[in-house]
Amino acid sequence: MPGITRRAVAIGSLTALATTLAPTKRARAQKQNSPGVSDTEIRIGQCIAYSGPASAYGQLGRAEAAYFQMINDSGGINGRKINFISLDDGYNPTKAVEQTRRLVEQDDVAVMFGMLGTPLNLAIRPYLNSRKVPQLFIAAGSEQFATPAKFPWTIGFQPTLRSEGVFFGKQILAGNSDPKVGVLYQYDDFGKEMLSGLHEGLGDKSSAIVAAESFIPTDPTIDSQIVKLKASGATAITLFTYSKQGAQAIRKIHELNWRPDIYLHSGAASISATLAPAGLEASTGVRIPGYIKDPSDPKWFDDAELKPFYEWIKKYMPTANLSEGFFLSGWAVGQMMVHVLRQCGDDLTRENIMHQVASFKDFRNPALLPGILINTSPTDYRIVKDVILQRFNGKNWE
């Protein structure tokens, strides 16, 4: 299927390299203007990987485009339609900077939204903060994106990697006062930040880490690392991986007839993408720090909060595979963006947008697990702070 031009409305295409949701004409009084805001539209910019090594994550951008299309079809936000311009960065920091400058300086967007990856968001953060352009609800878990004192225009969404590592450490100690911990981690900022959090969570018991084995994403297998971790005598293993290596690790652990307590990174916590390939029997007992529902899990099919999600995806993304968690994540952060804009009313200055971002009070996002509420402040930019220990029972999470 050919690419979609920047000025095409193409929500149904799953190969769009740039998507624009064009507004309809409507004259109305406006109290305050901001770059990217007119009487009829609010321009939202994004660059994300529609090509390159992380192109699978382009589904996030497509889901967000489809969510904004639904909002436009229902009348928009306070009378304005969303003009969503999403460009391809190929998961290349240099390209991300180029596309971001284009969106800010040529397309005159009000905000940048939902960009993917730690290195890319770090690359564009200085520019956006210097221009006082909101960098909102990014798809990166580094603690570096929750520092409002230094970068007040940048905020993430998911739990930070460090906090997840801390959670693992505390949960391991809660289950065993004298554990032996093995770690499999991706050798980059993602894995290292989680490992640092694990040390913090274990506190004065951090010497309980008896072995730590690393890998790089292009490694064809991690079997040798798992063999070494078993030889260490570890009774608990933390998998700071994404789905591919997580599935490989769980399967190899089972093949070795090794039965440690397994703690899996939330980013790999998909039944269909990780546990099923590893084997449901092999995956039984796997623990995760849960915070978002898995829409492919039958447990949620009749969930009242997710009913709008299932209706939306059936209408706007009928070919989407529910086993890919990108779609629910895109729907969830799209809701965050729309809530903020609605709270702004007619004061759609960038300053007020950030004021609303920092003013969530017990906000309930229906994609999150029951009991998780969102609270922010000018000094606390962590959106999802709470996670819940979940265990796989062979069929679903409990």
Residue ranges and their predicted role:
Residues 1-16:
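N-terminal secretory signal peptides and thylakoid transit peptides that target proteins
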Residues 95-98, 143-146, 151-257, 299-301:
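Extracellular/periplasmic Venus flytrap/periplasmic-binding protein
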Residues 34-38, 45-65, 87-93, 116-117, ...:
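Extracytoplasmic "Venus flytrap"
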Residues 42, 80-82, 107-111, 131-134, ...:
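Loop/turn elements at helix/coil->beta-strand transitions in domains of secreted/extracellular proteins
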Residues 253-329:
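Extracellular/periplasmic periplasmic-binding protein-like sensory domains
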Residues 315-328, 336-397:
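Segments of small-molecule ligand-sensing domains
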Residues 30-32, 43, 56-62, 74-148, ...:
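Beta-alpha junction/loop-to-helix N-cap segments that form part of ligand/metal-binding clefts
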Residues 21-43:
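C-terminal segment of N-terminal export signals and the immediately downstream linker at the start
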